């Protein structure tokens, strides 16, 4: 379980997050949504251990987070892949740093690539892949170390609408298959409503938790309902419009 208690943090010397309290249980998919500059990415970087926080605590499985760790896998918007390595070696890179023997790490990488639908692309280089394929490699790399928690920072923001839909459904299938805790940062309202088991809205400016919304659309998808059916459901449309109105309220209040 991820437990965030009374978290305060700065960014660029200015307060960015104020009194954040969140819990992410095993098997849940928490989505954090808010206007630009509300501290979404700062929150993810704190959980990943990339930057220090000023007050409060972040704990995973009862242990305080004070730096990066293999129990947290991170997927970035820009992928962060190594262009001089092929796809399989990119996925295996973290395992290499951990001292895993070569044949074992390549086998793990191969299995992860199968999970994300890239079987047969192991020897390609990053420049030979589409944007969606590169994000699949990033997800496979994050999963290779078998982390307790998967963190994703707007991973589909640069993709076209069709590819974004494919990646959303892939991530939901992986979430169901692995049972991992997942925390997704996004600015896309429809994506947030579709994918979250709990949606956290952050306020503009100094990031505070504005509202927490339990949702069931992701569970409906993994239970077998199509994404098209879900997104055309009046309940989904009403929730999307409600969240949109809340985000616009924050933008207007901060402008």
UniProtKB/Swiss-Prot annotation:
Chain sites annotated for binding ATP? 34-41
Q: Name one GO molecular function term.
A: ATP binding
Does this entry carry the keyword Transport?
yes
Record's bilayer topology term: Peripheral membrane protein
Its Enzyme Commission number?
7.6.2.7
Q: Where in the cell is it found?
A: Cell inner membrane
Record's keyword terms, sorted:
ATP-binding, Cell inner membrane, Cell membrane, Membrane, Nucleotide-binding, Translocase, Transport
> Per the record, what are the reactions this protein catalyses?
taurine(out) + ATP + H2O = taurine(in) + ADP + phosphate + H(+)
- All copies of the ABC transporter domain together span 2-229
Q: How does it assemble?
A: The complex is composed of two ATP-binding proteins (TauB), two transmembrane proteins (TauC) and a solute-binding protein (TauA).
Q: What job does this protein perform?
A: Part of the ABC transporter complex TauABC involved in taurine import. Responsible for energy coupling to the transport system.
Q: Which family does it belong to?
A: Belongs to the ABC transporter superfamily. Taurine importer (TC 3.A.1.17.1) family.
Q: What is this protein called?
A: Taurine import ATP-binding protein TauB
């Amino acid at each position: 379980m991820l437990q965030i208690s009374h978290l305060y943090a700065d960014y660029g010397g200015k307060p960015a997050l104020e009194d954040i309290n969140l819990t992410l249980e095993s098997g849940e998919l928490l989505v954090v949504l808010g206007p630009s500059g509300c501290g979404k990415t700062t929150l993810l970087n704190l959980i990943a251990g990339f930057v220090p926080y000023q007050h409060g605590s972040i704990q995973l499985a009862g242990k305080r987070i004070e730096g990066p760790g293999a129990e947290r896998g991170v997927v970035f918007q820009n992928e962060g892949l190594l262009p001089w390595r092929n796809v399989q070696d990119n996925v295996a890179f973290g395992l290499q740093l951990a001292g895993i023997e070569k044949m074992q790490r390549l086998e793990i990488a191969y299995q992860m690539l199968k999970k994300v639908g890239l079987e047969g692309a192991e020897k390609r280089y990053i420049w030979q892949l589409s944007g969606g394929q590169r994000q699949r490699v990033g997800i496979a790399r994050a999963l290779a170390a078998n982390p307790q928690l998967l963190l994703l920072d707007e991973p589909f923001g640069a993709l076209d609408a069709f590819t974004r839909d494919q990646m959303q459904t892939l991530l939901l299938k992986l979430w169901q298959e692995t049972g991992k805790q997942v925390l997704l940062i996004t600015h896309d309202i429809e994506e947030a409503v579709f994918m979250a088991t709990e949606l956290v809205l952050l306020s503009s400016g100094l990031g505070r938790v504005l509202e927490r919304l339990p949702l069931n659309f992701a569970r409906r998808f993994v239970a077998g309902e199509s994404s098209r059916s879900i997104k055309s459901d009046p309940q989904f449309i009403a929730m999307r419009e409600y969240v949109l109105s809340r985000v616009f309220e924050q933008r207007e209040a901060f402008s």
